[in-house]
Amino acid sequence: MKHFNFYICIFILISLPLLSNASSKSFLFDTVPDYKNLNNSRLESAIKFELTTTNYSPDTKSIFIKRWYETHKFQSIWIQSSINTLKIDTLLNFISHVGVHGLKPDQFDYSTISELCNKLKNEKLTYLELARLDTKLSYVYIQYCAGLKYGFINPGIFEAYHKSIQKADSVFISTSFNEERTHLLKYLSRIQPKTKSYLSLQAEKDNFKKFIDSTFAPIPLLTYKQTVKLGEYNPAIPLIARRLMITGELHYDPMYMTSYQIFNRRLLKALDLFRIKTGLLIDEEIGNSTINALNMTFAEYINKIDVNMERLRWIPVSSLGNKYIRVNVADMTLNAFKNDTVALNMRVCVGRQKNMTPLLQSKIFELVINPTWTVPNSIIVKEIARIAIKDVSYFERNHIRVYLLGKEIDPSTVDWTKINVNHQPYKMVQDSGSANSLGRIKFNFQNAFSVYLHDTNSKGAFKHHDRAISHGCVRVEKPLELVNFCFPDLNPIYKTRIQKNDLLKDKIRHSIDLSVLSKTGKETLKSNPKIMKIKRVVLNPYIPIVMDYQTCFINPKGKIQFRDDIYKLDSLLSKQLTAFNLN
């Protein structure tokens, strides 16, 4: 009995603080009788209670939001003594239209907040409900603003992406809340992405929405390696014609089932318009790649637009300056920009799927003239050693030297059958010159993957439609034009600096066996030919470069373009965007 009384006493002692705490928080469930006479101290206590008991995602934004409330003594951000829902309605209006950015309102708890707001207007809320509404609005507001400014998904979660993007910090949180108090509508309008590319994708999304309810019969795939050639009959032809009529490449004909039985010139012209838009090979045949693109639903095309708008949010053009280079790995092209306008365009060769070109942002800091090529270990093991087993003359033909412990050796003395991942002690270096795999010019930029832009000794590759053929580096079609782009644009009044740059360009030309162009270059070549040979040029300023992956974009002519997802990254990002929420 004594033990029983002892445990009763212990239970009472433990329970007293809990009962006391529950009693002190009982006002949380009190209905606020008159919003005009709102008890601010009770609301602040309710907000503190809400922040300490609700499990929001443990990201930096949540931490900074809590810190903002703490430093402002848990004052309400959205609810004041005289309840004015204008600011709340303004935020909800923007959230209701978040679909223009590829997300859905309920990913921001739109229904829950709307329900609380309606109750706020038509009934009386408890202090806890007011606190919940206030903190929920704050989280929604910051997530929305930060998402538009920096992206809703961190690209770092994907293996292929190696971009260090900006994130919402304490300064951003403070700025956003200060703007909320004074200029909410202007701030929400100002934070919308406004680059030409982004706005164009939004406009094209609206255009594709017009077709969302349009239906068309699936076009049956052809048998393996089969194609439909110009002038041939195929039962799929009228279905292809019908699909092209929906999006306007082909003029509507109600008798299409009989009008289009043969693959004729009119259909070819319409089909080529579609193939240009989707980056398909232009020829006088229809293959399964074309049929697969035609069979994509309009919802799938819209999803492709949404995914690529998110990619644009990751790297705002404003962070790159007025002059930069953007390699679109998915399109296998390079665009050099000046003031948001394409100044130079060229084809490139990129890494195949098993050797993906890393997606990153950096700065080109130097040009290497007549580079040597140190062969990567993986290529030695997987490719060159296997060739050498059958043909050791490969090394001489390709001007490749073999080294062991720093000394050059005769490759014919090596047992190449013993080379594998665990045993590869040799270093291979290809001599500089016209036969070098890197061509005559290499563009170095800082990165952790030893990749770079470079010329090539195999120019024919640029004629191919599929140029995802490299081991990860990017081969450029027009290296000399890219060199000229990398030089600073000077005002004509700086004649001495212009002459100096022209001479440097001529030194590059002379070093790769091209004729010099400038008067200064010609005079220097005559008077002092030795100084005309150079090995490297350090750029000043450095040129920003983005290795990007846009499977949907607007071309320089203002036309929307879709590209094959060669690295299968669209579906990964789409899943993350769909799964995005506040928790």
PLM region descriptions:
Residues Y150-N154, A168-I191, S197, A270:
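A sensor for short, sequence-defined functional sites
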Residues F4-F11, N55-Y56, S81-S82, L86-L91, ...:
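Hydrophobic alpha-helical segments and their boundary regions
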Residues M1-L28:
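Bacterial Sec-dependent N-terminal signal peptides
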Residues S24-A168:
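Cationic-aromatic interfacial patches
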Residues A22-E70, T135, I142, H162, ...:
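Well-ordered beta-sheet/strand-loop patches within structured domains
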